[in-house]
Amino acid sequence: MNIPGHEKGWLSIVDKSVPGNYTVNKNGHRFSNESQNYVSFVTDMFDEYEKGNPCAPCYMIFDSNFRKNRPCGPLLQASMQPDSRVPKEWWDPSFLSKADTLEELAEIVGIDAKGLIKTQVKVNEYSKTGKDLDFQRGDDAYDRYYGDPSVKPNPCLAPLNEGPYYCMVLYPGEMGTAGGLVIDTHARVLDIYNQPIKGLYACGNCTTALLPKYPGPGSTLGPAMTFGYLAAKDITGANF
C-alpha cells in the first residue's frame, strides 16, 4: 500500500486474508487467492500482469461491515477510527475510496462495474457454500491461520452486503535485502581477500543471502538464529 504522505509502503498480510473482502483487477475480476502468503500473492500479480492481466495495482474491496470491525492497512476499524477521523489526504482513488454502491465505487476507482458486480455475486455465493471454486481461498491451513474461526463455513470468506463500499489500492512490492556482508561458517565477516576481519561478526538480513530464492515468509529467521549461535561460539571459544 502506498499511503499518501508516507515514503515507505505498508505490507498487507492479515487484512487481505481475513473474511469480508476480495481483491480484483481493473476488469473487476479476481486473479489470486487473497488469503495465501504474501510472496505467492505478489508472484501471482507479476505472473498475471505479464500475461496482460491488469492486476498491478489491484483493488481490495470491502463493505461497511468489514470496515466497522476490521482494520485494513493503516486504517483502523471504524469503531476506533470512523471515516470522519481518517486523514483527508487518504481519500484519494490511488489509495482509499468510498461509495454508496458498487457501481459508484467502480466509477471512482476506474474498475469495470459489470465485472465487479459479477465477482461480488460469486464471492457471496462462495461464502455461503464455504468453497471458493476459483482460487480455493480458505482450503489451506495457512489461509485459515489468519481467518476468523467464528465465520462459518469458511473462516476466510464472508459476504459483502452492506454499503457503503470501500476500495483500498494494493501495489506489488519487494521486501528483502540485496547484497550484504559476506561471512564464513563462523559468522565472521570477510574482507575483499576472503579473510576474516578480526572481531567483526554478522548474521541475518545484513549478510549476503544464503538462499538463491526466497522460499516463503520467515525463511530468514532460521539462518539468522543459527549464525548468531555460531558467532557466539566463536567469540567465546565455547564448545556447545
Label each region the model flagged.
Residues 1-121, 125-240:
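Residues forming the flavin
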